[in-house]
Amino acid sequence: MGPILYCILACMSFHANVNVCHIFLQMWRPTEAKVYLPPVSVSKVVSTEEYVTRTNIYYYAGSTRLLAVGHPYYPIKDTNGKRKIAVPKVSGLQYRVFRIRLPDPNKFGFPDASFYNPDKERLVWACAGVEVGRGQPLGIGTSGNPFMNKLEDTENAAKYIGGNIADSRECMSVDYKQTQLCIVGCKPPLGEHWGTGTPCGTQNAGECPPLELKNTTIQDGDMIDVGFGAMDFKALQANKSDVPIDISNTICKYPDYLGMAADPYGDSMWFYIRREQMFVRHLFNRAGTVGDAIPDDLMIKGTGNTASPSSCVFYPTPSGSMVSSDAQIFNKPYWLQKAQGQNNGICWHNQLFLTVVDTTRSTNFSVCVGTQSTSTTAPYANSNFKEYLRHAEEYDLQFVFQLCKINLTTDVMTYIHSMSSSILEQWNFGLTPPPSGTLEETYRYVTSQAITCQRPQPPKETEDPYGKMTFWEVDLKEKFSAELDQFALGRKFLLQLGMRARPRLQASKRSAPSSSSTAPKKKRAKRI
């Protein structure tokens, strides 16, 4: 500002042209710094503890022994040609997403219902404790591909092969990354994986497609990340030989912990327990034309076999290492005191979702069946036997629920409606529609055939938002019990609270003998 003012005064002092001075004034501009306005106030998401009142009433609920048996690599279709699944795919590398159905506490029969007012309050369940029981012994399951894309052993290379082989695929098997996971919430968990994105222009054949991070709901039966990445192998690997056959035609998902932690209501993940471990067992490279060629300034080519470089697409085979009972997260109780989100364990819509992954019990059974009656004296032949693979899983789910009540004030109902309007509909609350401004018609003879049919429309059924998804349904509507001391998890919960169960059997006191049957007491003689 100082030099500009000096130039203006200098021009005026030497009788300069007025237009020149006008140009000097046009060159000066005010500051172009951005002005930041305060953000617009938005509605605040509050914790459920601010409008939910907890009672001292607890209930235990447990499932039956849950079993699943199937083929560990792929589903077996029916041989009748109806394309029905005869044997489902059941693998230790799948997500088990249980949808737990709970009874409506507002329709529950309580011995003493004086603790709440049904005209002004509504009841909800809060998850206080959970224990996931796992049966079957510890074991490691393997998978592989009879045509695995393996060119060279890059860890212990015997000789330089190069990329001149037409088909170098081999039969290989691996053991996967070790994962133990348990996620609890009232909505299904959210997963993430890498898939094919949308290119900006025309994409030629053989070009690498753009990648896009996609978020989808984790359903029961989805494959976990086994060590080859969370990606859509069906869309991104056309040769179906880069990974084992159980994931070569599907999607491996990884839980979106960041997205679920950022959920303002925290319904998808109240808390989670996770344990993962992996190390690299072998190092190989893949056959095929390298799409992104190595720059010439990064290497010096040789002669003979080293005239052209071999494939630089290196990859490892994962391994989960040893499994041990010392590092188990299952078969032990977990108590929910404070959730990581705003929902502190409230089971909206009388349901909760329990997601389980356990690769430490992924043993695959080998079942051998003779094709014909064979005797021990006949020579052994491979064609006389058929080999089958099966995998079995065993679960036992136990919960402790706390009864809570919500005071139906105007602010609370408005907040719950903004969070999920279906909750109020489930409580038999509806919004009155505004009066219509149009003139409606009303016929007198509603049964007359001279007018259009006046049959009332049936009420619209409530649509299940998860009706088209796949979950393991577990109905606990008739499994609730107030006698916590009669169950293992209930006794652990009472011990954790420092409470004791009420004694059921009281020792009977002996009745005092009648005065007629008692002998008179002798007076003690005084000593002199």
Curated annotation (Swiss-Prot):
Task: State the Gene3D superfamilies in the record.
Answer: Major capsid L1 (late) superfamily, Papillomavirus
Q: Which parts of this chain are annotated as the region Disordered?
A: 504-528
Pfam family for this entry, one: Late_protein_L1
This protein's GO CC annotations: host cell nucleus; T=7 icosahedral viral capsid
Q: Where is the composition biased (Low complexity)?
A: 508-519
Q: Name one GO biological process term.
A: virion attachment to host cell
Does Cytoplasm count among this protein's keywords? no
Q: Where in the cell is it found?
A: Virion; Host nucleus
- Record-linked InterPro entries: Capsid_L1_Papillomavir (IPR002210), Capsid_L1_sf_Papillomavir (IPR036973), dsDNA_vir_gr_I_capsid (IPR011222)
Task: Kindly state which keywords UniProt assigns to this record, in alphabetical order.
Answer: Capsid protein, Disulfide bond, Host nucleus, Host-virus interaction, Late protein, T=7 icosahedral capsid protein, Viral attachment to host cell, Viral penetration into host cytoplasm, Virion, Virus endocytosis by host, Virus entry into host cell
Task: Tell me which SUPFAM superfamilies the record gives.
Answer: Group I dsDNA viruses (SSF88648)
Q: What is its main location?
A: virion
GO molecular function terms here? structural molecule activity
Is Disulfide bond among the key words of this record?
Answer: yes
Assembly notes: Self-assembles into homopentamers. The capsid has an icosahedral symmetry and consists of 72 capsomers, with each capsomer being a pentamer of L1. Interacts with the minor capsid protein L2; this interaction is necessary for viral genome encapsidation. Interacts with protein E2; this interaction enhances E2-dependent replication and transcription activation.
Q: What does this protein do?
A: Forms an icosahedral capsid with a T=7 symmetry and a 50 nm diameter. The capsid is composed of 72 pentamers linked to each other by disulfide bonds and associated with L2 proteins. Binds to heparan sulfate proteoglycans on cell surface of basal layer keratinocytes to provide initial virion attachment. This binding mediates a conformational change in the virus capsid that facilitates efficient infection. The virion enters the host cell via endocytosis. During virus trafficking, L1 protein dissociates from the viral DNA and the genomic DNA is released to the host nucleus.
Q: Which family does it belong to?
A: Belongs to the papillomaviridae L1 protein family.
Q: What HAMAP family has UniProt attached to this entry?
A: PPV_L1
User: What is the protein name stated in its UniProt record?
Assistant: Major capsid protein L1
